Every structure is written in C-alpha cells, then in structure tokens.
Swiss-Prot record:
HAMAP family, A to Z: eIF3e (MF_03004)
Source taxonomy: Eukaryota, Metazoa, Chordata, Craniata, Vertebrata
Quaternary organization: Component of the eukaryotic translation initiation factor 3 (eIF-3) complex, which is composed of 13 subunits: eif3a, eif3b, eif3c, eif3d, eif3e, eif3f, eif3g, eif3h, eif3i, eif3j, eif3k, eif3l and eif3m.
Name listed for the protein in its UniProt record: Eukaryotic translation initiation factor 3 subunit E-B
Source organism of the structure: Danio rerio
Keywords, in A-Z order: Cytoplasm, Initiation factor, Nucleus, Protein biosynthesis
A Pfam family that the UniProt record links to this protein: PCI
C-alpha cells in the first residue's frame, strides 16, 4: 500500500545506515518495484565502505554485468585504510583491555580523572582520542556496528561534553546499538542524547529544532521495540512541549506513530486521558497530515461516525502491516480499536443489541458475545449482558468532583502549551535541513 508509505519522509531524517532495514522490509512487502529498491540500496551504499554488500546488490540488480572496476578499487582502498587504522589504534585498544584499566573505568565516573590515570599509567595522549574516534567511524562505515559501539563507548567516557566530536559520537553510538538491536543500550543512549540536546545552550533555536526532529525519527526504532517504548513515546511526543512543537512544525507524519502508541497502550485509565489530548493535536494538524490511523481517531472521537470509523479500521490494517515500525502492533491495535468503538458506541446508547454491535465490529453475533464476555471477565469493561434480550447494558462510572477538577486542570495546561506552540510556529518558519549522516561527518552535525 504505497499510498500511505512514509519511508521516503522518514529516511530524510535518518543516517543512511538506518535506512537499510526499512528498504529490506519494503522488499519483503513487495509494494515497490524490486529494481527500484535495489537501485536505492546501491545509491546509499555508494557513500559507505560496505563494498562487499554493494557488490552483492550490484549483482542482483545487473546479473549480466561485471562488477565495476571502481567498486573493486574501492574495496582495495578500504582494506588498506582499515589496516592502517588498526595499526594506529592497536596500542590504544590494548590499554582498554588491561584489567586494571577496566576496573578504573567501572569505578570512575569522571572522564577527566580516567584520562589522567591513562596518561600516567599508559602515556595516553589527547591525539589518541581523535584516532579512536576516526577508527570508530570507519568501523561504522564498514558495517561493523559492534566495533563502532565499543570504541565510541571508550571515546564517550573520556571526552568532555565540550569536545567537538562529543555530540556526534552520541549519535553514532545510538545508531550502532539500533542496528545491532540492543534495545536496552539503545534506550540508554537515546536518553543520554536527548539530555545533551535539551541542555545544549550553544545551539541556535533552529539547530535545536533540527536535532530534536532527528531524535524523534531515530527514536522510533527504540520505542517500538523496547518493552517500555510505547509509554515513553507518549510522554516524549505528546507531553514534552519542545518535541510536540518539533512534530507540529517539521514532521506531522509522526502523529501516525503517536496515535498507534496511544491506541495500543495497556494502561486503560491513562489511555482515556491521553486520548483526549491526542484528539486535540490530531484536530489541530488535520490540515497538514492525515492517514487512516489519525482519521480513525477523528471519526470515532470527534465526529462519532461509527460507520466511517469501521471503514478506517479496515484501512488501518493495511497501513500497519506495511509499516516497518508498526507491523508488530497490528493485533494490539485491532483489538483495542474495536474496544474503543464498542465503548464509545455504548457510552452514547447505554444499551445496545449484540447483533447491532457485531455488525459495527465486523464480527458474528457469537464472536461479539464471546468478545464482550472476555472483556467483562478481564475487568476491562463495566457492563452486563442480558442473554434473553441479547443486549449489552453499560455500567455507570461516576467520576468524582476531585477527579473532574484534576482532568480539567490538565486540559487547561495542555491547551496553554498548544497556544504557546502555535504562536511560536507563526513566528519562526520551518527550515528542513539535511539529515545527520554520522558516518560521513568529521565535526558532528553542524
């Protein structure tokens, strides 16, 4: 379903190495011409040192042609450069492999003290850090992400936050952990990078906006694979004003992922309040971005159009199954979306026939009754079934005045943030800069 594919938009904000998994996914889904995807891979690989991979792609794309001499020459050059960097880095790596050095690294949190220890015991010098950084980048360019992550960890421990390569190394470490699918380490790196960006007083507002936009896109890999990711994405994208502002200004298509995280959230009480806030954002941005997922939310919670919501839900299945980040959410999404339709419909009608409900949920009456019984049994629904009449009767959940005051206060606070963001959006014009390509940079992203 190429109509709703966001790969091109998202790739604009990713390092080229992070785009490869997306292209592999599209290749499996067969929604694009395979030759076009292979050409896209080859174009991306031309700026990396993954020459063997590039040769394989070239063979698949042009099975009747010989491998170009330029690729063979590049391979020779890359191997020579790798050997040179290995020889330069070998004494540095041996320092870090020393058991006493490893104990010092585990016990010492201060990079300056550790640097002084290495300088005293191993004659460590400042230029070694630059060598280590270059070697880490080269390993990354070659597709050796585990080596890159290891050397970037050493680099990060030793350099101060003011170092010209400090921020760039954080991006590289995050990318490496993502590509190795080390989600715990990636979440830690994501948090560290976010803190660095948010506490940066040197960058201009535009640079900070660009950095946050990149972080939002890179974080999708982590949030939709880490066990706590769907909670964290809501907190960051919806309730952190600077990041919500970045989404509204630079990348409203991210609302697809925020909406999916909200709909699939397992905390029922939290989900209801979050949905209210999400609906406000979707309404506000509907003129800049919409797809079946955001339209489903709008049909159900703004227009109360259950027939349209049901149609959009069927479209959502096609969107989810063809989205690299969301395909694993499909079952949770459909289950919870049906629950939302059911709850909203019953909240309006209070009493409803099971046969009518089955029609709204695209189920048989027997399936619908079993589904409702399971909801009641699992305490996810306050309702009773009248089997004789074939009706479902909703319970009456009274909300305390205290809770009403809290919700109204939250709503006012949220609306104030939205108003401030709208003013800021009108003052500053968005400027989409090129994506950070960590491996091709020498001095970070600026």
């Amino acid at each position: 379903m190429a109509e709703y594919d966001l790969t091109t938009r998202i790739a604009h904000f990713l390092d080229r190495h992070l785009v490869f998994p997306l292209l592999e996914f599209l290749s499996v889904k067969e929604i694009y011409n395979e030759k076009e995807l292979l050409q896209g891979k080859l174009d991306l690989l031309s700026e990396t040192n993954m020459v063997d991979f590039a040769m394989d792609v070239y063979k698949n794309l042009y099975p009747d042609k010989e491998i170009p001499h330029s690729l063979r020459d590049k391979r020779t050059t890359v191997v020579a450069q790798l050997k040179q960097l290995q020889s330069e880095t070998e004494p540095i790596v041996k320092m870090f492999e020393d058991p006493e050095t490893q104990r010092q690294m585990q016990s010492t949190r201060d990079g300056r003290m550790l640097f002084e220890y290495l300088a005293d015991k191993h004659s460590f010098r400042q230029e070694y850090l630059d060598t280590l950084y270059r070697y880490a980048k080269f390993q990354y360019e070659c597709g050796n992400y585990s080596g890159a992550a290891e050397y970037l960890y050493f680099f990060r421990v030793l350099v101060p936050s003011t170092d010209r390569n400090a921020l760039s190394s954080l991006w590289g470490k995050l990318a490496s952990e993502i590509l190795m699918q080390n989600w715990e380490a990636a979440m830690e790196d994501l948090t560290r990078l976010r803190e660095t960006i948010d506490n940066n007083t040197v960058s201009s507002p535009l640079q900070s906006l660009q950095q946050r936009t990149w972080l939002i896109h890179w974080s999708l890999f982590v949030f939709f694979n880490h066990p706590k990711g769907r909670d964290n994405i809501i907190e960051l994208f919806l309730y952190q004003p600077q990041y919500l502002n970045a989404i509204q200004t630079m990348c409203p298509h991210i609302l697809r992922y925020l909406s999916t995280a909200v709909i699939t959230n397992k905390d029922v009480r939290k989900r209801r309040q979050v949905l209210k806030d999400l609906v406000k954002v979707i309404q506000q941005e509907s003129y800049t971005y919409k797809d079946p997922i955001t339209e489903f939310v709008e049909c159900l919670y703004v227009n109360f159009d259950f027939d349209s919501a049901q149609r959009k839900l069927r479209e959502c299945e096609s969107v989810l199954v063809n989205d690299f980040f969301l395909v694993a959410c499909l079952e949770d999404f459909i289950e919870n979306a049906r629950l939302f339709i059911f709850e909203t419909f019953c909240r309006i009608h209070q009493c409803i026939s099971i046969s009518m409900l089955a029609d709204k949920l695209n189920m048989t009456p027997e399936e619908a009754e079993r589904w409702i019984v399971n909801l009641i049994r699992n305490a996810r629904l306050d309702a009773k079934i009248d089997s004789k009449l074939g009706h479902v009767v909703m319970g009456n959940n009274a909300v305390s005045p205290y809770q009403q005051v809290i919700e109204k206060t939250k709503s006012l606070s949220f609306r104030s943030q939205m108003l401030a963001m709208n003013i800021e959006k009108k003052i500053s014009h968005s400027n989409r800069n090129e994506t950070p390509n960590w491996a091709a940079q020498d001095t970070g992203f600026y």
